[in-house]
């Protein structure tokens, strides 16, 4: 049954210089996009779930490893355990929003979206023959369900480590909050907050709890519905007790001494229109998707009220998550900054096709040399995680690491994700709240 509305292009009246017409889609497209493992399991020659990939056999698995992970295993930095492919379904609310609204979505000439309400903007299978496939795919990622409508991450530990020695150089303990003002599908109000005079799409707020010298340092980011409008970002400096606006160039600086830039948050935390985007094709890759309580867990945090423990670390410098990897259908999205002075040459984002979340990111410098690796481990929300997340239909952020290959340094990120709107209301994401919380 056709779900997409047939749009007739009359060449003399509607030129390509206006908008790219919406493509019709079918229920089969929906199934393939959101339920790829219902009747199919990805395979690869020489691979069996349960295999351990190490320095001795890595060449056998090269085709199903991202380029950085292949390098690390080949160099003896880590070996990885594998497990069978499992289903990570998103909430039916998000799928239904796609059915209701995707047929009206089009691309404007500047690459922005037109008529987007909620759900997955382009549920059709991307094609390398489509010159706009990369632009469509990045919007599916940008408006994906990575944090649901509202997410709190607390506790959230960032540990700076020397890759060579494993020495812990510093540890920051955060609390983070994420809120979608529009395109909402789960929490009321849906699909948007009625009062949003700033036309904000998303708010991000973080506060440092420890160590003492950085306590109460806070960051606030407003991303706007108009993607051509630059984000606003503010930093409350705890020891100075004042708010300062971040300049545009500071989003590519190291954030609080870590291996992440603000632009790196969640894989890519910037405007779609700041990059040129290309679809690099589909491939089956080993990705860190798992059930949290089935992994080897650390003994931290201690005395958590829910009895929660972080994923543990292993490998060279203790820079790798101690988790299992599973073979999943993945889309390669290649982003190249339009600014010739940008420190990054390109981002290679490996998107999990079912959840449209970033499973790994490999960045290259302007010379074309591999620079950083940034995987995000995903835990199942219904199995082996917190009761508050059950039924939320989100592939939960569960562990991440940024390895700066050139600097020989890494930042591991261990966290407790909660999909809830108990705390996350618009008044939390204001400059006034920065001052209030910093007192």
Feature locations, PLM:
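Solvent-exposed N-terminal domain segments of exported/luminal and surface proteins
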Residues: 23-231, 237
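C-terminal soluble interaction/assembly domains
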Residues: 336-421
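Bacterial N-terminal signal peptides that target proteins for export
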Residues: 1-8
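Long, C-terminal catalytic modules of enzymes
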Residues: 418-439
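Coil-to-beta-strand transition motifs
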Residues: 199-201, 212-214, 226-229, 240-242, ...
